[in-house]
Design a protein with these regions (language model features):
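Acidic, PIN/NYN-like endoribonuclease modules and their adjacent C-terminal/linker elements
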Residues: 1, 103-132
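Short, well-structured N-terminal submotif of metal-dependent ribonuclease cores
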Residues: 1-39, 54-61, 67, 119, ...
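Alpha-helix capping/helix-boundary segments
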Residues: 8, 43, 82, 101-102, ...
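Residues that scaffold the ATP/ADP-binding catalytic core of kinase and kinase-like folds
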Residues: 11-13, 50, 124-125
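Short, mixed-charge aromatic SLiMs
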Residues: 33, 67-76, 126
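Amphipathic alpha-helical segments within well-ordered protein domains
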Residues: 48-49, 87
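Short glycine/serine- and small hydrophobic-enriched flexible loop segments
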Residues: 49-53, 107
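Active-site neighborhoods of divalent-metal-dependent phosphate/nucleic-acid chemistry enzymes
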Residues: 74-117
Length: 132
């Protein structure tokens, strides 16, 4: 197994730098079910942020990318169930992907709700806005 940093994953996804994109694509194509590429939760969160801020991708587009990565047999995503729940909510709910990841982890951990002062994060149906 190998691990990928955000910049390698982004180069693979956007193919905007020919040399780096070729290297990233080659590396990922060499991955397999027996020798997978591993992506951390942090890489997933940072990748979404980069796709939003630097490449102006919409939440729906990014959610589709995330589901494609989740379905790839040669890629293992840390806490994949959190990423799947967050990707689904992110595509439709309006809060930041990182907020959805926080809520997904809290749900998985058995929390009853997650309290926040962040109005956007409170859009998640699991979150409770602390001060109105």
């Amino acid at each position: 197994m190998i691990a990928l940093d955000t910049n390698v994953l982004v180069r693979f996804l956007v193919q905007d730098d020919a040399k780096q994109a070729a290297a990233a694509t080659s590396l990922i194509q060499r991955s397999s079910r027996k020798a997978p590429a591993w992506l951390s939760r942090e890489v997933m969160i940072e990748t979404v942020w980069v796709l939003e801020s630097a490449y102006d991708r919409s939440p729906a587009e990014i959610s589709n990318v995330l589901f494609g990565l989740l379905e790839a047999e040669e890629i293992i995503i840390e806490e994949a169930s959190d990423v799947a729940v967050a990707a689904e909510a992110y595509g439709v709910a309006g809060a930041d992907f990182a907020d959805h990841m926080i809520a997904s982890a809290a749900i998985r951990s058995g929390a009853e709700t997650i309290y926040t002062f962040d109005k956007k994060a409170a859009r998640h149906n699991f979150a409770t806005f602390l001060v109105k």
